[in-house]
């Protein structure tokens, strides 16, 4: 439970030492901590030194958190998991609900992350939403991307991730910002077109964004009610243990620990001791420095086929595999012990959960009557916008309708769509206006696609026939800009063309009618005299 967090903060005189978090993180991967990191340094000593020292300087900069801050994080996020169920409140009484965020939310997670794997990183979505209609009703855009192997730390500092995922996120931020409400999956692949050397606009990667769904996210998360009951028991036991610590132990700890004692404990931490025990101030450091210089001056390269070099690599691999097996066995024992202990009926009964209790152990914000009423009101309000709009709205609807069967789009489609719509939004075009337009039309398409598409001719009533025909031709160009159309997409494109042609005829009809009612020019006197003859 979180009483250990309180104890650690008390031992630090009100400060939580971040070195303990770093040590726990390193314990998750003993092979890298105890062997691989050092082996890679010496196996590539000619090039690895600067990078190793740079990382160690960053990794060894342990931060401190105040006790109230750290305790709140552990109780409400790590154990209570209250953020994903809208249970957190600010000091002025405002509820923190992730569904109220209107900017796109981007989630990047990895299956190689043993701290926040995809089921945990995406679990808040299934906690807050029952279905895709819920997401649309809250006008929220969620984009998630997954990596196959990168670890927890690598998500933030890996060079390969920085060159690929981070760069693509930054370069496509305007595209992400214009995505319609709903859940989307981002995939970053090698660009199919060859990169032009010296061309700054060439991109090595092609970002594709396809429509996803709650069901697809649920397949990743795999919600387990029994697991929720176990964690509910953990949270309750943690609250009891923390209350006991605060009542009976904490007063004594705070009375005994002084600022000077906290400083001594800080310096005696194993991670800091490793830097202090061996440094330039060590008596043997000068001798080692001279020996190292002698080795540098007399080093001789060996062939890759050298049996001792191969034996060295094989031995290193064996050590890594042994430590990995130890880690896997340890983690499996922890998981089985956790499941066994907190699944016991006695333990769950002691935390207020009976055997025949069908109520979910965690609140579900999407299942409350207030939420259902709010959703119904939002959908009713959206229905009123089906027949409102103009040429820009008609263009967006046509593009969405044709490409809906594809289920994905890449950066080229968004750039072409922007170029197509920009002239019809006026001289004051900005990305925010375009984003609002796209999101609104996407909501309407998801609400009632047939009605929204059928309303396109009505949106073009006040548009000149020439402009309607020009826009229809541009839609064909944008839709076929990158890929060959499928039979379904071709049929939808023909349907859209027919709707624009219908609007063209409707626009021409008033002009013909006006021309037929124009009075004839008056006859001249010469004409009248000719008739008199």
Give the predicted meaning of each segment.
Residues 1-68, 182, 197-299, 303, ...:
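Alpha/beta-hydrolase-fold enzymes
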Residues 59-95:
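Mobile cap/lid helix-loop segments that gate and shape the active-site cleft of serine hydrolases
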Residues 101, 107-109, 113:
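Short beta-strand/loop motif that positions the catalytic acidic residue
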Residues 356-533:
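Small-residue-enriched hydrophobic alpha-helices in membranes
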Residues 1-31, 134-136, 140-141, 146-149, ...:
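A catalytic-pocket lid/entrance helix-loop region that shapes and gates access to the active site
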Residues 250-388, 393:
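Extended non-globular C-terminal regions
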């Amino acid at each position: 439970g979180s009483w250990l967090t309180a104890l650690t903060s008390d031992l630090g005189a009100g400060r939580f030492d971040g070195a303990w978090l770093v040590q726990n993180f390193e314990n998750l991967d003993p092979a890298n901590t105890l062997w691989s990191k050092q082996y890679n340094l010496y196996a590539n000593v000619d090039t690895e030194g600067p990078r190793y020292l740079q990382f160690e300087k960053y990794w060894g900069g342990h931060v401190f958190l105040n006790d109230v801050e750290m305790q709140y994080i552990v109780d409400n996020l790590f154990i209570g998991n209250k953020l994903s169920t809208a249970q957190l409140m600010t000091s002025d009484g405002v509820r923190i609900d992730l569904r109220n965020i209107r900017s796109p939310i981007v989630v990047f997670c990895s299956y190689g992350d043993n701290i926040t794997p995809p089921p945990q990183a995406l679990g808040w979505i299934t906690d807050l939403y029952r279905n895709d209609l819920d997401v649309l009703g809250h006008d929220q855009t969620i984009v998630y991307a997954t990596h196959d192997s990168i670890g927890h730390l690598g998500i933030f500092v890996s060079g390969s991730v920085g060159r690929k995922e981070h760069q693509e996120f930054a370069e496509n931020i305007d595209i992400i910002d214009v995505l319609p409400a709903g859940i989307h999956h981002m995939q970053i692949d090698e660009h199919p077109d060859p990169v032009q050397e010296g061309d700054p606009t060439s991109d090595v990667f092609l970002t594709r964004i396809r429509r996803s769904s709650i069901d697809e996210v649920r397949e990743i998360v795999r919600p387990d009610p029994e697991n929720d009951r176990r964690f509910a028991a953990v949270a309750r036991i943690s609250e009891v243990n923390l209350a006991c610590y605060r009542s009976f132990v904490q007063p004594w700890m705070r009375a005994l620990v002084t600022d000077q004692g906290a400083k001594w404990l800080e310096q005696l931490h194993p991670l800091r001791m490793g830097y202090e025990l061996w440094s330039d101030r060590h008596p043997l450091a000068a001798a080692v420095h001279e020996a190292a210089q002698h080795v540098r001056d007399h080093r001789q390269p060996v062939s890759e086929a050298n049996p001792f070099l191969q034996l060295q690599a094989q031995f290193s691999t064996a050590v890594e595999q042994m430590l990995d097996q130890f880690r896997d066995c340890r983690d499996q024992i922890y998981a089985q012990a956790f499941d066994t202990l907190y699944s016991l009926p006695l333990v769950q009964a002691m935390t207020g959960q009976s055997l025949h209790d069908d109520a979910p152990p965690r609140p579900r914000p999407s299942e409350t009557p207030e939420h259902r009423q709010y959703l119904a009101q939002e959908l009713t309000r959206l229905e009123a916008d089906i027949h409102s709009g103009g040429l820009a709205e008609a263009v967006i609807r046509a593009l969405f309708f044709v490409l809906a069967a594809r289920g994905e789009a890449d950066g080229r489609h968004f750039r072409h769509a922007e170029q197509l719509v920009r002239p019809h939004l006026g001289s004051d075009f900005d990305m925010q206006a375009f984003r609002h337009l796209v999101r609104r039309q996407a909501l309407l398409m998801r609400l009632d696609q047939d009605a929204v598409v059928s309303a396109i001719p009505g949106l073009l009533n006040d548009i000149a026939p020439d402009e309607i025909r020009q826009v229809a031709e541009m839609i064909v160009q944008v839709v076929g800009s990158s890929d060959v159309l499928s039979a379904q997409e071709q049929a939808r494109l023909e349907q859209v063309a027919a709707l624009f042609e219908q609007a063209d005829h409707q626009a021409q009809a008033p002009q013909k009618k006006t021309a037929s009612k124009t009075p004839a020019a008056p006859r001249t006197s010469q004409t009248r005299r000719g008739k008199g003859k």
